[in-house]
């Protein structure tokens, strides 16, 4: 037990704790998130393997959480979130370890840590686990606009939106995009 942290593995019973950490992390990052009902359906309806939730707690409080999806011997850390003020306690390390341990318990031979930009701090973190990069290629048949100039302002704006309003926007955007 590192810094008094404990990892708990489960399914639907951990959904509220997972979503609390996920949504707060998304807000800290200044990004849009998926609505809670998306994860409810994922946890309850995933039929291609296992869908497991892992929650890391400090003194009973959820401070890190992740979703593990398995399919045909492969496991993917599909969503991963920690509360920033607890990061000095190495929450992400315990969370990854617990997700990997669960993938191994389920008989998976491959574990994916999710996407990251080459050279980014997240990518460097993942390289500590002796990972092998698998490049992703994106193709488009139309000219793409570079939103990078708007992104810093949008991030700051999203951080200011109250959580209940952000959840409504997330649900609306999810319906339009997916």
Per-segment meaning from a language model:
Residues 1-88:
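A conserved beta-strand-loop-helix scaffold within acyl/acetyltransferase catalytic domains
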Residues 13, 70-73, 96, 100, ...:
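Membrane-targeting and insertion segments and their boundary/processing signals
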Residues 18-21, 82, 104-105, 148-149, ...:
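Generic signal for short, ordered secondary-structure residues
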Residues 26-34, 58-62, 99, 161-168, ...:
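Short, charge-rich amphipathic segments
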Residues 41-43, 87-88, 100-101, 145-147, ...:
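Short, intrinsically disordered/low-complexity patches at protein termini
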Residues 44-48, 103, 129, 151-153:
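Alpha-helix boundary/capping detector
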Residues 108-178:
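Active-site/acyl-donor-binding loops of N-acyltransferases
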